[in-house]
């Protein structure tokens, strides 16, 4: 039985509402791209349609969330947190020397509102794709929509500050967002005392984990739940380095309730460590990659809704329920048993060395449990 005062979080990986997805929403941006191979964002829509079928244009704002929207409502989530990996801007000032640039038109912010997203993590390798003007417009747009954000700001102090999310009758959740160069974040995107940018994570040593854990605790009050959202690691591959696991373990041992990792285009390992949750790579949640070949074995079309129930008094995990989804036609769809089983087997394979197992329920949801007691 879950305690009445427990806090249920929804966490997911990269939400990439720019480029192709932006083109099918009611207010598409100028489709001009500055990529080596594709110069028009509408080409990504055509690629997706070539393998998945017709995608509606001028789609309703809630279209992309598909079956995930009803699942969120059913789960009675207290706080909805995403990694927003797209600027929200009409800026034309694209970052020179960068191969890929993501942006969503500001008038399409209603697609984020439609899913009742509470908090956007911004410290990633696409939030400054359209320059400092693009970042400033992104922040203004989120503020105007009353959506909390963390990880980017007008200076280093603002970028490092948490999103403070008050949950009446339950307490507070502090969400911190960090971007690592291992995910492709340019060093020059680091915010400084006199320059806008992101909350830059220079390395993933235990020493740095100790330092930033202290910084996070300095913002907290008694019984606050602290989430460290980290954009780190390569796009493809399951291997975790000793430094990555050591970094995550150090954060947990210093009182962080959840390590929310993302950047990989596919689901990676999850771990329950000291009765707290580590998500090493949540995988892309929404993107426009349909029709792009080369990494099919990773099944990046399958993703997970991570529903973590936390005891705010101890910061410990009470339940980790994962709901599989399949991305098709730029929309999140429920999966069948075979796809749910594939994800469950993957999590067991990756979690076994970490002392974490996955159990598949008849409704195709997956529960994480510690195998170490």
Named regions from a protein language model:
Residues 1-373:
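Acidic, metal/ion-coordinating pockets
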């Amino acid at each position: 039985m879950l305690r009445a005062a427990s806090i249920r979080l929804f966490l997911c990986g990269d939400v990439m509402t720019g480029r192709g997805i932006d083109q099918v929403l009611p207010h598409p941006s100028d489709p001009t791209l500055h990529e080596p191979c594709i110069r028009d964002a509408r080409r990504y829509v055509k690629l997706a349609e070539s393998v998945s079928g017709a995608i509606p244009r001028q789609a309703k704002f809630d279209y992309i969330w598909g079956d995930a929207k009803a699942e969120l409502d059913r789960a009675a989530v207290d706080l909805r947190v995403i990694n927003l990996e797209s600027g929200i801007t009409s800026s034309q000032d694209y970052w020179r020397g960068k191969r890929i640039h993501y942006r969503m038109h500001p008038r399409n912010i209603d697609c984020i509102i439609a899913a009742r997203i509470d908090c956007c993590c911004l410290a990633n390798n696409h939030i400054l794709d359209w320059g400092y003007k693009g970042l400033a417009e992104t922040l203004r747009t989120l503020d105007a929509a009353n959506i909390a954000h963390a990880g980017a700001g007008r200076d280093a102090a603002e970028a490092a500050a948490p999103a403070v999310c008050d949950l009446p009758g339950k307490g507070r959740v502090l969400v911190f967002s960090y971007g690592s160069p291992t995910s492709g974040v340019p060093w020059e995107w680091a915010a400084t005392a006199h320059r806008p940018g992101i909350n830059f994570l220079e390395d993933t040593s235990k020493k740095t984990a100790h330092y930033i854990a202290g910084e996070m605790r300095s913002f907290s009050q008694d019984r606050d739940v602290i989430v460290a959202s980290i954009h780190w690691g390569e796009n493809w591959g399951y291997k975790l380095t000793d430094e990555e696991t050591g970094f995550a373990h150090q954060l947990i041992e210093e009182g962080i309730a959840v390590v929310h990792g993302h950047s990989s285009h596919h689901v990676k390992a999850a771990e329950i460590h000291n009765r707290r949750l580590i998500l090493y790579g949540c995988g892309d949640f929404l993107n426009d990659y349909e029709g792009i070949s080369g990494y099919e074995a990773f099944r990046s079309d399958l993703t997970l809704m991570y529903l973590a129930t936390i005891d705010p008094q101890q910061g410990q995990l009470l339940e980790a329920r994962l709901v599989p989804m399949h991305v098709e036609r730029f929309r999140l769809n429920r999966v069948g048993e075979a796809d749910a089983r594939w994800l469950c087997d993957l999590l067991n394979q990756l979690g076994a060395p970490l002392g974490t197992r996955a159990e598949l329920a008849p409704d195709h949801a997956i529960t994480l449990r510690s195998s170490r007691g």
